[in-house]
Amino acid sequence: MSSGESHQEQLSQSDPSPSPNSCSSFELIDMDASSSYEPVSPHWFYCKVLDSKELWIPFNSEDSQQLEDAYGSGKDCNERIVPTDGGRYDVHLGERMRYAVYWDELPSEVRRCTWFYKGDKDNKYVPYSESFSQVLEDTYMLAVTLDEWKKKIESPNREIIVLHNPKLMVHYQPIAGSDEWGSTSTEQGRPRSVKRGVENIPVDIHCGEPLQIDHLVFVVHGIGPACDLRFRSIVQCVNDFRSVSLNLLQTHFKKAQENEQIGRVEFLPVNWHSPLHSTGVDIDLQRITLPSINRLRHFTNDTILDVFFYNSPTYCQTIVDTVASEMNRIYTLFLQRNPDFKGGVSIAGHSLGSLILFDILTNQKNSIGDIDSEKGSLSSAEDRGDASTLEEDLKKLQLSEFVTVFEKEKVDREALALCTDRDLQEMGIPLGPRKKILNHFSARKNSVSINRPAMSASEVNISKENGDYLDVGIGQVSVKYPRLNYKPEIFFAFGSPIGMFLTVRGLRRIDPNYKFPTCKGFFNIYHPFDPVAYRIEPMVAPGIEFEPMLIPHHKGRKRMHLELREGLTRMSMDLKNNLLGSLRMAWKSFTRGPYPALQASETAEETEAEPESSSEKSNEANTEEPPVEVKEEAPISVGMLNGGQRIDYVLQEKPIESFNEYLFALQSHLCYWESEDTVLLVLKEIYQTQGVFLDQPLQ
């Protein structure tokens, strides 16, 4: 073997790779290049316009996968409608639009996103259009396959995207376009980062909501179109409330979720402000509004006047009709979209919305249709015992001879209660009988002032022909209350002025035996600094002074500043009691007369001081024992409005809020939407009706 041949063999052994000139060499290069390219994984986004700015929000992972499956299903994909966001929105694939299902909302644009660029004024990434994203993807595939980079792509709006390498891709926005001679300026603005695939951009993508819905809650807003200090709508605030509930289910009902006992609670908003102000009343108000302090007057017309609208017979009817019809409509639509739903329904109201729901609930009828025949009707025991006919009433008044007159005029007992002195005179009733009749029904109204609080806070007579018409004599307007298509299980009131409105209407107390005709539970939840909130329990038990139930912190125990405050209070009380006891003993010994012998006086003082000190100790012990006895042995009776349970529940203020109550007053009235403590109480009470409890009871 020659030296040249041996050298060639060594080269071949040391470098086993094929020669670049061979055909197999090209095939290997193409295989390596093509294998390094992987198609991009798309993710679906929708666009929300907030403050005239477009914000692209990703669908959760489950919804995005459903949209992608529908997109790749075939030719009919453009006709597909995919429910998203727990069934609250529908995406029309052909239109690439997202529509709200249960409420009115402007549709949102939907995109199948693969390529993104960083926005101008923030660090949020904006997706390219689907068509241009496909151009970028094709160019990227060629660059990776052929290993040829620094490719320039011009977008439809004449912007330049440069692919330097897989890690560096930039977007240039030209400062000036072509001039009048057709020449194009080469000056470019600040480059913006370009990313391929949603996994390469900073964005939070949630896993999605459980498919199983255990309970449905309707949420009614208060005055005005805005529900918090950020001027957000009821839809946005309820979205926050729902998000908090999903997080709390994972942290406080983890065992039940792992055992697949529970799914989630659906919260749906009910809007009555827009239908009310679409009646043309805003135009009428604008004509009489003074031109000065325009913004303040506009705010007043749009918000505070809602309270006066509710006290107007015309607009009160519009409000209750809107709330009831909206809840019935949404409930029917919800059942159509969720045919397997077997859970219960509850309602929640914030501020004035809670009063609207309170009045609607008190004017419902049970399934039999006769409220007075059911246990727990609005009438008191005295009123139920006096549920006589018109003939019996006239017989008691010794006016039986006028029965035929009333029958001829088709006046029944309820209609007679509505008659005035002039009406009776026109029917030919003499002055004496007229006074007897009017005095009789006036006395009945005054005697029933407590037993029908929910019936618009006054004595209410229910017509036999139409049980929804109310005769109200102490301030509440007379309207026809619609019937709900379901029986709510629990009524939650957030920051509610119900107690104040009932008092203003002339109601001083609530019958302890009263309960809603169709609703079993009632929780009055409020922040201690909320200027709009009022208590309910003192109206049920006016002779007893007691504190509301303190809502536990969602992380357990009380807030540290509250525990510290209670500890200091107890310490000061102990010091005060000890000091007073010492001063009392010294004063008694000082005012006691002198004894003949010093020793005798000392022994006498000792013998008297011992029972006194023991009595002081026993008194101190007695002063410390009653709170324990009240909590354990003597539960407070607050009537049947909440099934015998407590009604008033107060939140714990935050440490910073305790420094100045007035500074946080307005915020306290709007804090419920994002309050974990409020949401956890709602979830706890709802799931208790299903036999599901917290993983660990809160203290």
From Swiss-Prot:
One of its GO terms (molecular function) is diacylglycerol lipase activity. Residues 1-25, 599-635 are annotated as: Disordered. Residues 484-688 form the DDHD domain. It comes from Mus musculus. It is found in: Cytoplasm, Cytosol; Endoplasmic reticulum-Golgi intermediate compartment; Golgi apparatus, cis-Golgi network. Residues 603-613 have a biased composition (Acidic residues). It catalyses: a triacylglycerol + H2O = a diacylglycerol + a fatty acid + H(+); a diacylglycerol + H2O = a monoacylglycerol + a fatty acid + H(+); a 1,3-diacylglycerol + H2O = a 1-acylglycerol + a fatty acid + H(+); a 1-acylglycerol + H2O = glycerol + a fatty acid + H(+). One of its GO terms (cellular component) is membrane. InterPro entries: DDHD_dom, SAM, SAM/pointed_sf, WWE_dom. The keyword GTP-binding does not apply. Forms homooligomers and, to a much smaller extent, heterooligomers with DDHD1. Disruption phenotype: Knockout mice display memory and cognitive impairments, and locomotor defects such as significantly shorter stride lengths in gait measurement assays, reductions in rearing behavior, and reduced balance compared to wild-type animals. Mutant mice also show age-dependent increased levels of triacylglycerols in the central nervous system, and accumulation of large lipid droplets in brain neurons. Bulk brain levels of phospholipids are unchanged. This is Triacylglycerol hydrolase DDHD2. Its main location: cytoplasm. Residues 383-445 form the SAM domain. GO terms for biological process: lipid droplet organization; locomotory behavior; mitochondrial fission; positive regulation of mitochondrial fission; triglyceride catabolic process; visual learning.
